[in-house]
Design a protein with these regions (language model features):
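Amphipathic alpha-helical segments of tetratricopeptide repeats
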Residues: 21, 28, 54-60, 93-104, ...
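Short boundary/linker motifs that mark transitions into or out of structured domains
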Residues: 185-250, 254, 296-333, 337
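Positively charged, aromatic-enriched patches within helix-turn-helix-type DNA-binding elements
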Residues: 252, 256-286
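DNA-binding patch around the recognition helix
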Residues: 280-323, 366-383
């Protein structure tokens, strides 16, 4: 490897893409194309970066498997950052295997981190845990350790393990400072803000108050029956009844939970669950059917009883019932929560992350755009959607993916 290529690679490793480009901008050999692609990615020009990396992968000879694998990893990272979640996973898996087999532990670990970050983004937490298992980051350079601990922190946050998340973020910050890359330090600091953001609202006895993530963790461990409107579930300590695919049942459970220890009139439940302005006999019959289904689903945790004017919810083992609501109740809040990260998402990537159909997501995007809450740019397959981050807006911390759609 010649001196200019070495110097450009060192500049990229130090977070200096302009310094790298000064050395290789006019060269078209395979190593230079790869370095130019990575530099353009660091500068945010993802379209040009992908084109350069594809050219580099083609330019490397058949005996340069490691170099081609590194190009694949770089392409995968660009796809992740640009929210192209449809990028082929198998290509990254194959590249990771090649790098591992040839002793390139640093880039193999980076490939695994990308795999985990994608799984984390689309809510497949168990698979993300499995990918991380057995990876020892201690021998990795500081920048790679930072990336690893950011992933560990992200998993811990999604699992409401705030102590583990703080410890991972502290390790990530120390490693980022050791690496001396300002952008990496800023990324860690941004991730740490999640622990200080409002994660939900506690609704009980006619009042509500905001909760931080560690307070949500304490709530889930307490002797309280929680109607979880963030994950569409009913939980008491370690027992969880998911209603994520039963939106009508969850709507009824939430209404009964908010009214506890009182009851909810039948006509009010019809209006809430079925959006009917006037309850006729067919509505009441449907309500009886849905209440019967809810009663069966909640048998381990609570009892749904009939009262003179409606229905009430009574916990079986818990002391009280509360509702954990998102920071802001917003139509299509799951879509807005993902867009709140400030990145530009395609509708197909949103559908993958939410486990919803493309048609459902497209309809939600059109309604949000009509309301002026998001903006779209580009045409056809290149169309992307984004929104400014709104203070107090529901984060994706509590989103399990998939959630029920209309």
């Amino acid at each position: 490897m010649d001196s200019l290529i070495t110097a450009a690679a060192q500049a990229l490793a130090a977070g200096d893409p302009l310094g790298a480009l000064k050395r290789v901008a006019l060269r078209d050999d395979a190593p230079a194309l790869a370095l130019r692609g990575i530099a353009m990615a660091q500068l945010g020009d993802f379209v040009r970066a992908k084109a350069l990396l594809k050219s580099a992968a083609r330019a490397f000879g058949p005996r340069e498997a490691v170099a081609r694998a590194r190009c694949v990893v770089a392409e995968a990272e660009i796809a992740l950052v640009s929210r192209d979640l449809g990028w082929p996973e198998k290509a990254l898996d194959a590249a990771q295997a090649v790098l591992q087999a040839h002793g390139d532990r640093i880039n193999a670990a980076h490939a695994r981190n990308l795999q985990v970050r994608r799984l984390l983004l689309i809510g497949r937490l168990d698979e993300a845990d499995q990918r991380l298992a057995g990876l020892d980051p201690s021998a990795l350079p500081a920048a790679a350790r930072t990336a690893h601990d950011l992933v560990v922190a992200g998993l811990a946050i999604r699992r409401l393990q705030t102590r583990a998340a703080r410890e991972a973020l502290m390790r990530a910050y120390d490693a980022a400072r050791q690496a001396g890359i300002p952008a990496l330090i800023a990324e860690v600091q941004g991730a740490a803000l999640a622990l200080q953001a409002t994660a939900g609202r506690l609704v009980a006895l006619g009042t509500e108050r905001p909760l931080l993530l560690d307070q949500v963790e304490v709530l889930f461990a307490s002797d309280t029956l929680v109607i979880d409107a963030c994950r569409h579930a009913v939980r008491h300590r370690g027992s969880v009844v998911s209603l994520a695919t039963r939106p009508v049942l969850f709507t009824l459970a939430r209404a009964l939970g908010e009214a506890w220890p009182g009851d909810v009139p039948r006509d009010a439940l019809v209006a809430i669950a079925f959006r009917g302005k006037h309850a006729d006999e067919s509505h009441r019959a449907r309500l009886r059917v849905e209440i019967g289904r809810l009663r069966v689903e909640l048998t381990p945790l609570a009892e749904v009883t009939a009262t003179k004017r409606g229905f009430a919810l009574t916990p079986r083992g818990a002391q009280e019932i509360v509702v954990l609501a998102p920071p802001l109740d917003e139509r299509h809040g799951d879509v807005l929560a993902l867009l709140a990260d400030g990145e530009a998402w395609s509708s197909s990537a949103l559908a993958i992350a939410l486990g919803a159909s493309a048609r459902t997501v497209q309809r939600a995007l059109e309604q949000l755009a009509a309301a002026g809450k998001i903006a779209g740019f580009g045409r056809g397959r290149s169309r992307r959607w984004t929104t400014p981050s709104v203070p107090g807006f529901p984060t994706s911390l509590l989103l399990p993916g998939p959630l029920p759609s209309d």
